[in-house]
Regions:
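Domain-level recognition of nuclease-like catalytic cores that cleave nucleotide substrates
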Residues: 31, 36-43, 253-304
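Acidic-basic catalytic patches of nuclease active cores, encompassing PD-(D/E)XK
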Residues: 148-196
Length: 304
């Protein structure tokens, strides 16, 4: 290790160090260490190891965040190393992502106190996990290249179809975990009239089909990662609730004013993580429910 004074002289006076990465770390109250990484390979390895993008240099690094993200990558690689199949089932993938996120970042209390943040955190971890598995399974094949256009298309279709399938189920799995953590009673993929299947019926499928059960105590929720065009599917998923609000949880950031007006006319209420609501038309944001508000509403209706 070089002294701070020597490092400063080297970085300022020697042109060969222009563009080098200077890393200055605090060891304790009195001692510091400084490093100069001058090759692209060394710089890339450092940034990759700590999950730092090139745009995040020239500033203080949150050591706690770096440590957590490094732990997350290690946990993901350990999970992949233990797999006995190419890709786990969607439910297993989501559960693994929640387990990794909960272990690394903690804050299990957010399931109750801040479900809006928790569901985004789980979703982000699952996305990172899925990408890591894709890289482990397909990285070498892609690096080698393809012998024909057909071979490339076959690979691309396989990857895209798996991505679509995972994304469609991921939100449902994480919502189930939020509901379980809040002791909410529900049936996932309940069967209603004409074999229709809303994603969630509260409190249960049995209650829905019990004509003596009060309609005002029934709630339906659809889960769609994106809903720009498919939101109309939720309108007729439960005949008993045709004149009641239909709730639609989505991770889509932003919908046009015209579509929001159409949703309102069909009595569809959007449920969106709080962090995403600002991406919606400002004069219509008051129509949107946060996930926290929806959870509180269901708990109230169920008398919890």
């Amino acid at each position: 290790h070089l002294s701070i004074r020597r490092q400063r002289q080297m970085c300022i006076r020697d042109r060969e160090y222009t563009g080098a990465l200077f890393v200055f770390t605090k060891c304790d109250a009195e001692d510091y260490q400084a490093f100069v990484l001058n090759s692209e390979e060394d710089i890339d390895q450092f940034l990759d190891a700590f999950g730092i993008s090139p745009t995040e240099t020239n500033q203080l690094i949150d050591a706690g965040r770096v440590q957590e993200e490094t732990q997350e990558r290690i946990a993901i690689q350990e999970f992949i190393a233990g797999l006995t199949v190419d890709f786990p089932l969607s439910e297993e993938m989501s559960a693994a992502a929640r387990d990794i996120q909960n272990r690394v970042y903690d804050h299990l209390e957010f399931i109750r106190t801040n479900p809006d943040r928790k569901i985004i955190d789980w979703t982000n971890t699952e996305y990172a996990l899925f990408r890591a598995i894709e890289h482990a399974r397909y990285g070498d094949a892609i690096a080698r290249g393809f012998t024909s256009v057909d071979e490339f298309i076959t690979m691309a279709n396989m990857v895209l179809n798996r991505r679509k399938s995972r994304a469609g189920k991921s939100l449902e799995h994480h919502l189930s975990a939020i509901f379980d953590g809040n002791e909410i009673i529900y049936t996932a993929q309940a069967v209603t009239e004409g074999n229709k299947k809303p994603d969630f019926i509260f409190p249960s499928q049995a209650s829905y089909h019990d004509m003596t059960f009060p309609t005002e105590r029934l709630i339906s929720l659809a889960a769609k990662t994106t809903c720009k065009d498919r939101w109309r599917q939720v309108i007729n998923e439960a005949d008993r609730l045709r004149d009641r609000p239909k709730y639609l949880c989505t991770l889509q950031q932003g919908i046009s004013p015209a579509q929001m007006d159409e949703m309102q006319s069909e009595n569809v209420i959007l449920v969106v993580p709080r962090q995403y609501i600002t991406s919606y038309p400002a004069d219509r944001q008051d129509r949107i429910w946060t996930l926290s508000k929806f959870v509180s509403y269901v708990r109230e209706v169920e008398g919890l």
